[in-house]
Amino acid sequence: MKDSNTSKSKERASYARIRDELSDKLFVQIVEKLGVEKRYLDPDYSAKKLAIDLHTNPRYISVVVGLHTGDNYNALVNGYRLRDACRMLRSPRYSEYTIEEIGLMCGFSSRQ
């Protein structure tokens, strides 16, 4: 009986390690799409669209983002948008733009 329990424990540990590795890999892909490819600039780029791009499902996206950031998908996307907006607002290059225009350029869809 002890060997059976030990075997099951090792099997569970293996599954957990695989899950962690897959979660890490998916998070890297999420960051690649959002941060590097700047897909967040599209106001309609949803978790569902990201899941389609990554050949997974939106639930996995939500779980992985939550595990790695403590936030949800929308908070992650808005974080990227806010960083861009802050950078643009500080830049003399964008001094002639309104806050609303900058927000729209950063992927926000409205003034709300």
Where in the sequence are the language-model features?
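The DNA-contacting recognition helix of HTH DNA-binding domains
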Residues: 58, 110-112
